[in-house]
Amino acid sequence: DYLDAQVWFNLAWIDPWLRSQDARLSSLVGKGTHFTEEDKAYVLERHLGLMAAVVPTYREAAARGQIELTTSPYYHPILPLLCDSKSAHVALPQLALPPQVFRYPEDAKWQLEQGLTRHEKTFGRRPQGVWPSEGSVSEEAAKLAMEAGVKWIATDEEILWRTLKTSRSLSTLYRPHLIKRPSGQLAVVFRDRELSDLIGFVYSQWDPAAAVNDFMRRLERIQQQFQQGPPILISIILDGENAWEFYPNDGHDFLLTLYQALSQDQRFRCVTISEFLQEHPVDQADSLPELFSGSWIDGNFATWIGHAEKNHAWQLLLQAREALAP
């Protein structure tokens, strides 16, 4: 029955916990079939109500200091490629690029400023941090962030190793770094790819308790290596919306168990990045060399440029850019 399919499709998109908090939604789940148009209308009405509550909920949590909100460039562009499409050659020198270079750093600046401005209008305060789209960074894009007054950015650990031209070192990974230039300075945090990807792609197939136990054991092994030194920052960064639909119960059991374990273990403390930077300022004498150009996908930009159809799209974009705003 088409009506049953419509209702179930929209019911399934409502989180199990949210369904459990609404008596009528719970009853519809129990009913299971022979839904009415009124049932469908109620489910769609709840969709609108839940969506309307998202921004206020985030705003309230940020005001309590429970979370930190960041922004990204406005339309999710790959900033380094807007600055200069040849930046793709830094990671992949042999990559076939479009014959005409796309170079509009002013567009990258606009995208960044619009993201910051929209965030401020929506949440009442300008964010201190920026997650560049797809963790895509370059020296030129980082300077734009400095000029915009951004305090910190984050990206993948692969960018750190390629910037420093070194192999993986936990003592290097688990501290913020500084980009210090004549035009300003910017803190950079690099995510632990292994720990982040365990949550993003692996633990969804595990029993929640076993997954949390494994994660905590990994944290314990790291903590044992740094007991005598200053506090370290282990950055867990992943797409916030993608993982949970693959977990049982939308990840509620895993997340509740994880936060309970972290809250009860005095060796660990959950912090926002700005909170850590305020308590443990970045060493002013420890500035990174020129930031490597790449993303959190294999440390390069091949996802967005370098294939025939993508190169053609960049040429069309360049033609449109030149025609509309020469």
Model-assigned labels for residue ranges:
Residues 69-72, 128, 152-155, 189, ...:
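Hydrophobic faces of well-ordered beta-strands that scaffold small-molecule active sites
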Residues 32-49, 94-108, 126-133, 198-213, ...:
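The substrate-binding groove and active-site-proximal loops of carbohydrate-active enzymes
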Residues 73-76, 129-138, 274-277:
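Short, solvent-exposed turn/loop segments enriched in Gly/Ser/Thr/Pro and often Arg
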Residues 63, 122-123, 139-154, 252-265:
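Short, surface-exposed basic-aromatic patches at helix termini and helix-loop junctions that form
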Residues 1-27, 168-326:
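Active-site and substrate-binding clefts of carbohydrate-active enzymes
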Residues 94-132, 219-237:
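CE4/NodB-like, metal-dependent polysaccharide N-deacetylase domain
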Residues 1-92:
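N-terminal catalytic cores of secreted or lumenal carbohydrate-active enzymes
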Residues 89-109, 146-181, 187:
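Acidic, His- and aromatic-enriched active-site or binding-groove loops in soluble protein domains
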